[in-house]
Amino acid sequence: MTSSVWQERRHGEDKQRRFDHRSPYQRDRARILHSAAFRRLQAKTQVLGVGMNDFYRTRLTHSLEVSQIGTGIAAQLRRKYPQHKQLLCSMSLLESLCLAHDIGHPPFGHGGEVALNYMMRDHGGFEGNGQTFRILSKLEPYTLDFGMNLCRRTMLGILKYPAPYSKLFVAGEHNEITNHRQLKPSQWPPVKGIFDDDNDIFAWVLEPLSEADRSRFTSTQEGSHPALHHYPHLRTQFKSFDCSIMELADDIAYAVHDLEDAIVMGIVTASQWHQDVAPTLTNSSDAWIKQELADIGNKLFSHEHHLRKDAIGTLVNGFVTAIVISEDDVFEEPLLRFNATLEPEFAIALNVLKQLVYKYVIRKPEIQMLEYKGQQIVMGLFEAFASDPERLLPLNTQVRWRESEQQGLNTHRILADYISGMTDEFAGRLYQQLFSPKAGSNVELSKEM
């Protein structure tokens, strides 16, 4: 592995700041942390809608927790595998990936994502991870045309689904929709991949790989996606070593910390835990899981906050310390050859917790109503802006739209960029501004975006 190749940036930088001793990955982390796109995560839905309660996680606090878990995983792997110290060369790199992993997700969570994907159905689709790649490499105004201009290895690590939309998309049968209110998310799952509009950047990221590695890394397969219950498209098969750590940290945070939110708010109960979780984990072949299960269950649903926090810490520690490094010797490049994976019994346990959150939290009618509302807001905004972009878009977005039109590029992508960058609250107020007769002046809104 030639580290200098992976530390390259698309746009060469000759900045020499006074007494700046930071590594390339420390600079990447700073750019992400100080970006407007990262700040907006504080007002974007994680699982529970923003404003429902002041306890639960937003996309921002979730990302901070993913970062902490990610560095914890790296520390454990460094201790277990000293022979792989070159792979685990930078905590700042992993922090960067974890902090940035949700930066492209639109307002209103999955509802907003499905809405944008539907509105972009004839224009290359929309998906949050693809938008993250686009923000980091093109949209965030740290540079004029190169986004945050991050290191190549950072960009490789953010690629959860390394294949373009056109390679993954499978046309499905859909009921004819005559009104946006009829849209069913199950019929319009976003393609998990990179937008074709960004293929040039994708090619640059993969440039150091051999032809064989590149071909295998971007290969696809049929089959349902593990994160989705209805997924007709092809799916990618591989991710880089750094990405595998980030994804595990994300899964642990989702399964454990979002479960904590649901327990505190009374959405998940002890009886549901004993019905859906305990039977599987009681039969686990792992001694630690069987030994800790009863104590964890009792503490999670205790009225003593410190006991619940102890159980949460025990769960996170259990998963983090059960992560190992696996090898796929078909790849030449070490960043692809090795991945972080969970031991099988802990992978089962993590999936059980994720299914618990999905069943009792995500599918809860009150949560689905909020998601549906967000879905309608996003589609309404998109339809309005698409009807007359040069009249309704903010001036700076109008400039981007006109440039895309003049160059024969995908102008609808500009609309998706603008709407996906909104917070839940801003999108809701803008919708009211456009469609409610009693809404006030647009002056205040224009100052925010």
Swiss-Prot record:
It comes from the Bacteria. Keywords: Hydrolase. SUPFAM superfamilies: HD-domain/PDEase-like. Residues 1-25 are annotated as: Disordered. GO terms for biological process: dGTP catabolic process. One of its GO terms (molecular function) is dGTPase activity. Residues 59-255 form the HD domain. The keyword Iron does not apply. InterPro entries: dGTPase (IPR006261), dGTPase-like (IPR050135), dNTPase_2 (IPR023023), HD/PDEase_dom (IPR003607), HD_domain (IPR006674), PHydrolase_assoc_dom (IPR026875). Residues 7-25 have a biased composition (Basic and acidic residues). The keyword Hydrolase applies. NCBIfam families: antiphage_dGTPase, dGTP_triPase, PRK05318.1. PANTHER family: DEOXYGUANOSINETRIPHOSPHATE TRIPHOSPHOHYDROLASE-LIKE PROTEIN 2, DEOXYNUCLEOSIDE TRIPHOSPHATE TRIPHOSPHOHYDROLASE. Belongs to the dGTPase family. Type 2 subfamily. This is Deoxyguanosinetriphosphate triphosphohydrolase-like protein. It comes from Shewanella sp. (strain W3-18-1).
